[in-house]
Amino acid sequence: MTTILRTTNLTKKYGSKTALDNLTLELQKGEVLGVLGPNGSGKTTFLKIIAGMHKKTSGEITICGEEPGIKTKGMVSYLPDRNFLYKWMKISDARDFYRDFFPDFNEQSFVKMMEVMNLDINQKISSLSKGMQEKLNVALCFSREAKLYVLDEPIGGVDPLARDMILDSIIDRAYDKKTIIITTQLVRDIENIFDRCVFLSDGRAILSGNAEEIRNERGMSIEETFKELYRGQI
């Protein structure tokens, strides 16, 4: 197996607040990792460190054997938890931005994703609903030939139709053996594609491992485990 992501005692502090606390895990090529927890548990901080947007405080993290930096930004396709495109853009401008900025951008994949998501290349970003914006962001993310896809709450707060389209796209990539990290609180919708899970609380991993082994050991689904671990917090 090829290790795509490895962390050892990964820690991130903001002043006196510890957002990520001694996180240790590995993700192999072709695996899907679910990063689960309530708001403020450290999920987004973890993803931003992987994406090279935040620097670790201590510990180790490597992506394909490299520490996060300019080189790994070319390996990681990151979908943040909020829209990152300028309102004045058309979808075609967003495509051009990705094509110019990312050498691994695959325009044929983007055209197919646009058809799947039922989006028009001439639409303005400012005219898109939240669900349509998220579909576009997912289309751009998956149009890169990246080593690792990192998705922060890709189905949160969107309408059911958009959620289904986004889920189908994620599931298709999982079946294609793409390496994916997903944060979500909508566990039921997506847990079947998880190979591994890590449950975070106050930045610490309170449960981590193979998803099927967690189900078998606890005698319940990943969603039920989520509800049990975070009862009173969600």
What are these regions (language model features)?
Residues 51:
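Helix-to-loop junction immediately C-terminal to a conserved catalytic motif
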Residues 33-38:
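The feature captures the beta-strand-to-loop junction immediately N-terminal to the Walker
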Residues 82-137:
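ABC-family P-loop ATPase nucleotide-binding domains
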Residues 208-209:
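ABC ATPase "signature
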Residues 149-153, 158:
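Catalytic Walker B motif of ABC-type/P-loop ATPase nucleotide-binding domains
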Residues 58-72:
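Conserved ABC transporter NBD signature motif
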